[in-house]
Structures are given as structure tokens and as C-alpha cells.
Amino acid sequence: MTAKEAADSVLQRLEAAGYEAWAVGGCVRDTLLGRTVHDWDMTTSAMPQQVLALFPHCVPTGLQHGTVTVLESGYAFEVTTYRAETGYSDGRHPDAVSFVGTLAEDLARRDFTVNAMALDVRGRLVDLHGGREDLKYRLLRCVGEPERRFREDALRMLRAVRFSAQLGFAIEPETRRAMAACADGCTVLSAERIRDEVEKTLRSPEPYRALELLDYGMLRAVGLEPGTARPWPTVTINSPATAWAAFRLAVPDFDPTIMRLDKKTGRLAVETAALYGPELTMDRLKRVVADHGWDVGRCLCALYGQTDLAEELERSGDCVTLAQLAITGRDLPVTGPAVGRLLRQLLNHVLEVPADNERTRLLELAAIWKENTL
């Protein structure tokens, strides 16, 4: 059973029990765009306890907000009671959630018109805010008054840029003006929330749109000021590390620690960005791997769109790391810190003369060079 078939089964069971039930939000938008749907969210007139009673396998994930996760045929679906939200005193979360009686009231609380459409199991579309028209013209527009929407929840501004990058949509002028007016509200957002939205934008078909977040002033909360970006680099992004390396190239002030990146991704991004510039040749890649390790080497190749170069080097078996030397530290005629220095000297030599990575030859060189490492 496909996810769509399982979602239809949930909608049908709700309807059979006498409730209204609709697929809603991004799944409807993506269906109309012919895109792959990853998550089917639903809204219903049924109260949370009624949903819990109707489905044998479900999880009460957010009862205070009316959400129950229904497990059906190996898929998980968020089913939420029609609701309205009031008061956003923290600029992020509603102060109160109330259950309402109509789909229209539920759709009115949503962020953008393209996300405010509902589809029933028979394919009937409810579009009260012009979402389908905006899909046609590839526009991202707020539901209702844009400034009000952004004052309610500052994260919506970052989501606007992210959606525009993922979908290739323009942001409607009034919505764009409201973003500029409300950008200071993003200071209430956590670094983790900002990081997640920036990364999704960076990994979209239009990653350069991430610089709009900077231009609007939405990234002040993570120490980044408008007007500090360089032109977007022509690079290939295929992982979180390459995404953040590209961002670092365009925004030199970007600090992975403030953005709460994990240590490995942050290190890879910074090191890879620092190495980007000259043409990437096989000889240069060998030096990068020898000095910085395979993770940085692969990341740099990916950034250049030359992953085949890393694969070629791995297949060759050429010595580019200390572990590939034909001898180990135990074979050397030195002790203590001199071991590491001599191994590094031998590796540097082998990078220049690959044929010398042979035990007898390396021991000869070690005997000659040992005095220089003491």
C-alpha cells in the first residue's frame, strides 16, 4: 500500500464515522504541483479523543493542540482537529488554541495561500485564499495580512524564503515588504530553528536564496549582519557539510558554533571553504587528503562537482595518509614526538615520489633524516 492509499484509508474511516476529513497543507500543494508528497497531514472535525477512539494504532503526540498521530499500514499521519490560534506574545507560539467547527476557520490560520488548501478523499479541493491561482503564477503569498502573520510567528519569514527556494517561487511584493518590516522579530528564534531553515534553503534547487535571509536582517540572532555577503559561489551541494561550506564562502562571518552546527559538520565546512579556490587537480587533492584527511578531501571534491576525482584516488591505492605508509612508527629509529615528525616527512616525500612507498626505501630515508627530527 502506498502512502497515498494509506492516507485515503484514514480519511475514509473518519468520514464513515460521520466526521469531515481532509488532506491539508503541503501535501495538497505538492499534489497539485505534481511533486512527490513526503508527508500527508490531515485536518478533521473530529475531536482528538474521537480520533483516538476510532483508530486502534495511534499516538497522542499533541493533544493540547488537537494532534493525534495515526499509524496506518506502516505510515504515520498527523490528524489535527479544526482549530484557531490566538495571541502570539512570544512571537513564535500561540498563547491559546481553540477547536473550531469549520474547515474555513482552520484554513484561515495558515501561513501561505499555497499551504491553505484542503483535498478530500474524492479529490474535491477547497481553496478559500487563492492558493491554486498563486501556484499557477508561482507566487508565495501570506494568508490574510502579511505583517500580522509574521508578527504572530517570526519563523514564517524564514519559511517564506525556504519555500521560495524549494519551489522556485517568487515572493509576492506585499509579503516581501512585510518581511523587511518584521525581520527584527527573528531575534526571538533559537539558533537551532534558524539553522534548520537555513540548511533546508541551502539544500534546495536555489541555495543562493539563503543570502536573502541575511539581506533582510533575519540572521542577526546568529551574529550575521546585512551587507556582509559575497557573491554566491558556483559550487555543487550534496550534503550538509558542502551546504555550509558554500554558505561560509559567501558569508565569511558565519560561525558554525553560534549556528549550533554539530562539530564534525562545522569543522568540515570551515576547512573545506578555506581550501576552495584554485583548480582541483589530482596532485592537489592528494595534498589535501594528506594534510586534512579524507572527509575534507571528499567534501572539497563534492563542492567542485568532482566526486569522481576522490573515487579515482581511492581506487588507485596511492599513499596519501600515514596509515598507507609501508612502515609504522614502531619501525623508526626515533622515539617520542620525533616519530610523528619523521612519519610526516616520509609521507610528504611519498606524495612527491609514490614509488618510494616501499619498506626498505622508507627505512633508508628514515635513517638519513632521523637527525633532523630530533
Residue ranges of predicted features:
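Catalytic cores of the polymerase beta-like nucleotidyltransferase superfamily
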Residues: 1-374
